[in-house]
Amino acid sequence: MRFKAELMNAPEMRRALYRIAHEIVEANKGTEGLALVGIHTRGIPLAHRIARFIAEFEGKEVPVGVLDITLYRDDLTEIGYRPQVRETRIPFDLTGKAIVLVDDVLYTGRTARAALDALIDLGRPRRIYLAVLVDRGHRELPIRADFVGKNVPTSRNEVVKVKVEEVDGEDRVELWEKEGA
């Protein structure tokens, strides 16, 4: 792959997540009954950051859970016979809560669909929102994000890479082009 552009640097990511945190609290009319669930892998640190921002300006802790969607994917046969299943840890009851699913990039909508299926198997939330750092378009399913850090129109031969300090050692969003495209 060939690097094309930096889409967001660390301060821009921070500002986008801070704005998303405010939008979540506004949409929910406060923090009552609110919880965040990060989708493996990079949705987890993003969810924790949003929760920290909410605690900063609201003075209330919002619970954060971790969701693995591996077994809910519709492309399991394409990713091999031994998919890497990771931990799902949701230390609170989902029933009656407003849940914000957090992911790094929204593309086809298939990850979000799998996350919805996994979440609903664990309880019956009052409402489910979707928050993403980057929405790159090209939906294959009728899914949209409620909270978006940045909309980035892309072509199908481009790849959006989100890097987070907790996983990758730096905060940055990059646009790459597939070779031979």
From Swiss-Prot:
It catalyses: UMP + diphosphate = 5-phospho-alpha-D-ribose 1-diphosphate + uracil. Probably regulates transcriptional attenuation of the pyrimidine nucleotide (pyr) operon in response to exogenous pyrimidines. In contrast to pyr attenuation in Bacillus spp., PyrR from Thermus could act as a translational repressor: the binding of PyrR at its proposed recognition site in the transcript would prevent initiation of translation of the leader peptide, resulting in terminator formation and reduced expression of downstream genes. GO terms for molecular function: RNA binding; uracil phosphoribosyltransferase activity. Keywords: Glycosyltransferase, Repressor, RNA-binding, Transcription, Transcription regulation, Transcription termination, Transferase. Substrate binds at residues 41-42, 82, 86, 103-111, 136, 160. Pfam families: Pribosyltran. This is Bifunctional protein PyrR. One of its GO terms (biological process) is DNA-templated transcription termination. It comes from the Bacteria. A motif (PRPP-binding) lies at residues 99-111. Its EC number is 2.4.2.9. Belongs to the purine/pyrimidine phosphoribosyltransferase family. PyrR subfamily.
